[in-house]
Amino acid sequence: MNNIPIKPKDAQWTDAQWKSIYANGQDVLVAAAAGSGKTAVLVERIIQKIIRDEIDVDKLLVVTFTNLSAREMKHRVDQRIQQASIEDPRNEHLKNQRIKIHQAQISTLHSFCLKIIQQHYDVIDLDPNFRTISDVENVLLLEQSIDEVLEKHYDTPDIEFLTLVEQLSSDRNDDNFRDLLKRFYNFSIANPSPFEWLDSLVEIYTDDNKHKLYLDELERLSKIYIKAAYHTLLEAENNFLNCIEAEKHLDVIKLEKFKCEKMIEGNVINFEEIINYTSEKLPTITKKLKDTNEDEGISSQFLTNAKDFFDDYKKLLSEVKNKYLMRSYEDLKVDMKRLAPRIQYLVQIVKDIINGFAEKKRSRNVLDFSDYEHFALQILTDQEGNASPIAKEYRSQFEEILVDEYQDTNQVQEAIISKIKRGDESNGNLFMVGDVKQSIYKFRQADPTLFMDKYHRFTKDGDQSGLRIDLSKNFRSRKEVLATTNYLFDHMMDEEVGEIEYDADARLYFGATKYSDKSMPLELHALIQDKSSDNDLEKSEQEARYIAEQVKYIIEHKQVYDMKSETYRQATFKDIVILERGLKNARNLQQVFKDYNIPFHVNSKEGYFEQTEVRLVLSFLRTVDNPLQDIYLVGLMRSVIYQFTEDELANIRVQSMNDDYFYQSILHYMKDQEANPLLVEKLEHFMDDINMYQEYSQSHPVYQLIDKFYNDHYVIQYFSGLIGGKGRRANLYGLFNKAVEFENSSFRGLYQFIRFIDELIERNKDFGEENVIGPNDNVVRMMTVHSSKGLEFPYVIYSELSKNFNKGDLRKPLILNQKYGLGIDYFDLEQNVTYPSLSSVVIKSITEKELISEEMRLMYVALTRAKEQLILIGTIDKEEALEKLERLPISGNQIALHKRLSADRPFDLIYSILAKYQSTSLLPEYRFEKSIDNLDESLRPTVDIKIAQFEELSIEDSESEQESRNISDLEVEGSHDDTLKQQINDQLSFKYPYLKDTEKPSKQSVSELKRQLETEESGTSYERVRQYRIGVSTYERPKFLRENKKRKANEIGTLMHTVMQHLPFKETRMTETELNDYINELIEKHIIEEDAKKDIQFEAVMNFIRSDLYMTITQADKVYRELPFVVNQARVDEMPESDEDVSIIQGMIDLIFLKDDQYYFVDYKTDAFNKRRGMTDEEVGIQLRDKYKIQMKYYKNTLETILNSKVYGYLYFFQFGQMSIEEDV
């Protein structure tokens, strides 16, 4: 390291940042904590290489994690070069950089690998016309490769193969086995040499020396729990020693101490002692014993605590015995030998899949992203495994290699970088920046140990190795955010769990000195679920309402400090983000926020396959493909499409309990003479549908099948009408588009498409709606913690902390680990017995530790997004659980290791640490520090713990009292809030050269057009989507949500339109009895719900039947109801058509009738209007005519345009009567 310039006194950089910018002459690792300005440092280093060292920009290789990061980095560098050129216009070097920036290699590693392949394809005998494989082809070719390999083995089955299939498959099929092989494939190709890694898996089972790797780890894990058990036993003893007449209890403790000490004598595990261990029975702690102690002034709590500690001790030893040491050392080693042939066979299957898949891709001349890396590595490596001549050319070309987000690098990427970097660590040209505490992509095979190995190897002075620089000053957050985050992770994270020691170097230090001294404590909300009978809300719904209350409070009472003006401003919606581990709660929040009139956005591209509308369509496709899948069949039947009730489904099943499949039960029920005839009719309709779709799928592509399903059942229209309709519609179109993409591949058929979708689900690959909001849109955002990485928000609400970690992989029969290999239980095919093997026990425990470590790092990412304040929310069932968390055992300065290794959810760790800090009554053995004075300032938290009973919260259904507003409503309602209107207009109007066209919607309903013209607002863009009117039952809230609630005006309006849509026109006029019978018929046919009857304005309908208009319609030649229309607005407005884009008007006419060659239309209105005292009917008529004048004009002109004939019309108000509009428009 040399030539670091002296930092000027007025430099904006910290000493560590300055050093990071100018250090050279050796490999440099910058450990950049959250908010420490790493991107600015990286850009400045690149700029100084160009300006100060006069290195051409295309002589630098800058590797970023995403394409977006690469574009932003290149843009920043380009701007700085331009700025430098303006300041020094005669500098020819800078002028050249303006040209070379476009060829600069600032990209993802995938993009760099692709360039290597494009330039050197001949080295690996690759056709230069290769293309990147599509998702569809990639998924299905891999599936096809697996099929062919398994088919070969099924044809000539080996005993080991049969054992594997039996062990790793379900009772019904081998889908689980296939899924496992796909995971195995993906794990393998994340290694630089997949075949070598696969061979190493077998060696662990065959080589006695390799067994020691597992045995050592088993012993280490066992020690953790035995030592924790012994410590817990000592606590029990200490509590008994404080009591009198507890000698018998102490005798048991003494005996247990002797046994426990024998288990780990000389710090070596005695397997026999543990396997043969049986616990002693502790004498009962009687009321008499408690009373005796109380009489002597000794709290009986000592006895209770002692008993609890002793129970915990027994539980810990039982866990060691049952989890790690069920069988002897020798038995475990024998099992490993027996498993070796099975592992050898499994490895060969995976090798065959790799080869088969590679051959299929090569024959089609396609590459996937893993091929980019492996082919590039192949080009850069000679036959001896050293750098090839091509790699050496790249070494000469690049003066420095800069890697961003180094903690997310995998083994293959590390191998590629090592081939093109110069020198070793002490004199190399590799600059790496990242933060292992933010390594959260293990599911993509990111390997944080690569970062940690260098972190430990490199030194702060760079002596004899690489240079390590810690950027620990945070310029983002208030002191309270940083100190509390430090305090949490100081007591939670270390190398054992978290994979880094959270020491003085890892901590966050306050750097945003412009913040005022206003106190903003971290708020931890423990929401105790109300399970009372009068509250049916689920835990997630309760939490969603609570979150909405917190948002309201922030908006009404909190401020944001503006660094530039050094003043406060009121908090706005865009200052708030809601972070959760996943997005399953998004729909709940969306509904609740709508009730609260809170603008809200969630990027539902994540969690796509979990969305209700997508699951419905997939259930439909799976049922059509194979109705013998009960979950999907029943799911489709219960859906809004077919609306079978749980009682109906139960009745079907009860009739034939012994059927293997629900489909068989349906067939049997339909033949049952005693079956409910209405249910049989409903089933016949359903089965006819399924048969029809099955037949249709045989001769039509999948996308046409989906389109038919959408159109037959108004699927798009229904989901468009729900909360988040735009996103739901985008999700449905996304699935349709995937089917179109599938059809363009070489694969065909519904079965293959479902396999493709299943693979996307397995890979957690989403393709839902795009993020359609900008950074300045004033909405509350919801996103996953993963999505929030790199972002910052004034207020962070980190919720769903009580959601359990996803430990599903730990329950699988085979577990993979890059370092420790493959863990599989031993399965005896003849005896049909499974029991844990040495490998499965060890790898399961290691994988659980790695999983919790990554979850801990996700917590760190979430907490470090906040600038002003953190609000943490968790929900628990009982308040007693909080007391247990407060008393979690500690070891040294941290939560006891065994508790962290077995943690189930973030809330347990966070609450325990903060509650211990705040408690004034906690015993010393549960506390981390005796006094706050003992704490370093960077660790001194500011915390406000709030425990709330849900029943105490206000959960009024604001939906019944509040109405959402749009910009068009503001002026109609008489609002003079011009600032608000302008703000909304500014957000909705995207400025670009063709602004006039963008402010004119491509398609509008007549109602929308009416509001637009009434308010003279133009600039709201409506998405172009087909819309159809459907029955009220699909739009109504579920029955359980409507109980004891009045329908809203718009719901009653829809209900009345449905009644009128089917109303018979009889020349003799309907009687009240006939009308009542007609309404009952609508209920029986499920057109309206039974509870809707009370909201039908019965007398108003009768008044219509008694009217002249009713009789006029009965005498008409033709009657058309609910007629949709779409028409060019220019033609309706009688404007000359031009080449410019036109606007389309769409709408629905309630009724049209033809009489004496003259067309008339009728529009029903259920409006309630205030008739002021003294108003005449004529004045009311004038008011109503004016209100609907524009809408009726467009109805009339539209129909005249379509029919090419004069059209007259009527408005019919249920509260006023008919009104001719033939002369008024």
From Swiss-Prot:
Residue ranges of domain UvrD-like helicase C-terminal in the record: 479-790
A cellular component annotation (GO) from this entry: cytosol
Keyword tags: ATP-binding, DNA damage, DNA repair, DNA-binding, Exonuclease, Helicase, Hydrolase, Isomerase, Nuclease, Nucleotide-binding
GO annotation, biological process: double-strand break repair via homologous recombination
Names of the cofactor(s): Mg(2+)
Subunit structure: Heterodimer of AddA and AddB/RexB.
Stated name of the protein: ATP-dependent helicase/nuclease subunit A
Species for this entry: Staphylococcus haemolyticus (strain JCSC1435)
Lineage: Bacteria, Bacillati, Bacillota, Bacilli, Bacillales
